[in-house]
């Protein structure tokens, strides 16, 4: 090969190598003076605002942990509400050379294939938001969970709802001494939905709120589905609905949208409570369209996952005091209502701007 052809070949090889580095996601390589941590993040869907916000915050936290000796590459994929598809995406991440996997399961009862694939390649897994069954998480010492205690969120939601109802007699519109309510439930068989539903209602009753159930409706954590369910309930019950309890803010916002479109004046609306502390829900609380939410602290969870990913990669010891049974990290929920909405809304706006 003459020198000109050899030079072209070398340049072409370098160009291809650079392209591979840029496009390879988990498989990207760094120079020899720095280590590269490759983190694969696989969510159950790409249509959940809370999960999207948590993923963005995780990427920001990992970016902040880069230094001269450590580069961090984050690749994200969605399971699109299909466990089989999520399994395939996990396999792709493993084949691409990821060092740590952060997985938000489609089906919390079906992580076996993911665990088997990760264990075969000795890749630690941090499950988040959707807690696997305990027996599955205990299969291997490199499996972890980061999230919140769903029971706590249900209790807190019941507490802020009871406090509001007990101090606002106008909630009982028909003055029958009972609060007629509907409940928007996230997903059939989902542990968080079950716990939030059970403990929110129990806590209301424990705090001397006499309830009359009009309807429970499954809406799959989805705003559009919740709006459709509420449209039917409004047609059926009209102004009889005095309270809407929702397993998450997205569905609560669906209820808000239904009442906006129904033509009711604000005084005719029921009181509405959600869970997650989404910025749009906090704005609805500020506007008086919702009466409260329970903040699911995505920043705290993202910080913990990022720290764990780096520690696993570096082979460092965990702070065992922060992990229950050496496997679980639960961040604390926080109550948000009219009394502290400005504090949390300002904090949420700051977080949102930092993620841009």
Each predicted region: which residue ranges?
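Flexible loop/hinge segments that line or gate small-molecule binding clefts
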Residues: 114-152, 176-177, 278-286, 291
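Hydrophobic alpha-helical segments within soluble ligand-binding/sensing domains
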Residues: 86, 145-176, 226-227, 277-281, ...
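Hinge/cleft segment of the Venus flytrap/periplasmic-binding protein
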Residues: 35, 46, 177-188, 192, ...
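Extracytoplasmic "Venus flytrap"
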Residues: 40-61, 65, 75-88, 98, ...
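Short, low-complexity disordered leader/linker segments with a strong preference
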Residues: 1-38, 94, 116-123, 352-356
